[in-house]
Amino acid sequence: MRYCSTRAGVQGRSFRDVLFSGYAADGGMFMPENLPSLSAETLRSWRRLSYRQLLCEVCELFIPEQEIPREQLEGLVSSALSSFSVPDAVRLVQLKDSLSILELFHGETLAFKDLAMSCTAHFLQYFLRRDRQRATILVGTSGDTGSSAIRSVLGLREVDIVVVFPRGRITKIQELQMTTSVAENVHVFAADGTSDDIDVPLRKLFADADLVQRHRLMSLNSVNWSRIMVQTAHFLFAYLQLTPSLPEGDTLPVLEVLVPTGGAGNITAGIIVKRMGVPLRLVAMVNANDIVHRTVQSGDFSMSSSVTQTLAPAIDIQDPYNMERVFWLLSGGDGLMVKSLMEEFQKTHKLSLPASLHQQLSEVLSSGSVSDDGILEAMRRCWQDNHYLICPHTAVAVWRHYQSPVRPGESRCCIATASPHKFQQAVQRAGLTLELPESLQVLDQLETRCADLKCSDDWEETLRRHIESISSRRNS
């Protein structure tokens, strides 16, 4: 398995190469040069696997044996998921009205990102220790990514992590999960802007090849292929758990998956699984920040003038950068076309998809947009019907379930991306109550540490100097 850039300028890279990369040198994102195919026979053979076992099978498709041997791979996955609070790391809950919810939030920071982040961090540690090297991780977050990334590398001597979050645009718990991480290898910045504003200097820093090489700078955002790879496993797990049977022959039942969508990494993983041969009907669900919905419906891939703050802050995103991977997949790997499209979008923040590409997109993906009122409505109804509380992001998917009956002969799954415990304001707005677990209650009592990125500051230069100071400290 080799990897290439979505913009055609880089080919033939190893898994290790892309693991330690942010964006490719040409500004693109890494993808497998060829996707493996999953036959009906293979899916049947995986039917009784646990999530952990299935994840190993998936990773083996994309990580050659000579890079991480199977025995070591199994050990890394097992160790990565050892701190999750349920036995198999994920849990499927089946409720009234054919509502099935795949809970992906049982990691230490109570968000689905813990699954891919913990595995990716263990893969990093494997190579860094083997090669006796160090790395600096640079991460921008809209809420959940930052704390998950910090937790995955907390205290590792081989890694420093720099995390930037948008001040005032995430929940208090999300902020405290980052700022109370005062380990020597953790560096947290609060920026006076949106998560999309944060992405701009980060992309520029990753485009500086000399900076990346000198400081071994890398990303744990979903620009990192490893995150997408791991996320493909929960789509496969949902399919194998919820399809009633896999009859002999090549005709397989369909599973509809409703996916809360922000940066589009999760929905990209779903599309990859679909392209590998699994019959998924994918629905990207967004909040008022509806660029993905508009793109699917009309081909209008254009940013709004500002990011709207909603009750689902982790998907308050107007620049869903993983859509570049989707465009590359659907164009048949036409990197030159993707390069042209994305350079236009990055320059003007507006793009009208070519008709053929929009048609391809609308054939593989449906979409919907939900207001804050709809989020609260879904939270209330799910509680009233089931005494089951969902977070506002999960509610974006569950709202669609309540509005649209399941098609005859099909099954459906809603992806639960975070625990409701992290979103007390939304829970209270819905007229519901939820007692915080002790791990969150104590956050207010802990020491915090955070640096500022003010509107008047040069964010790129400030972060560049900090990255250089980290390397200087290491080498002293």
Swiss-Prot record:
Superkingdom as given in the UniProt entry: Eukaryota
Keyword entries, A-Z: Lyase, Pyridoxal phosphate
A GO BP annotation: larval locomotory behavior
Family: Belongs to the threonine synthase family.
Species of provenance: Danio rerio (Zebrafish)
Family matches, as CDD domains: Thr-synth_2 (cd01560)
SUPFAM superfamilies in the record: Tryptophan synthase beta subunit-like PLP-dependent enzymes
A GO molecular-function annotation: pyridoxal phosphate binding
NCBIfam families: thrC (TIGR00260)
Essential cofactor(s): pyridoxal 5'-phosphate
Protein EC: 4.2.3.-
Role, per record: Acts as a catabolic phospho-lyase on both gamma- and beta-phosphorylated substrates. Degrades O-phospho-threonine (PThr) to alpha-ketobutyrate, ammonia and phosphate.
InterPro entries in alphabetical order: Thr_synth_N, Thr_synth_N_sf, Thr_synthase-like, Threonine_Synthase, TrpB-like_PALP_sf
Residues that bear N6-(pyridoxal phosphate)lysine: 113
Protein name per its UniProtKB record: Threonine synthase-like 2
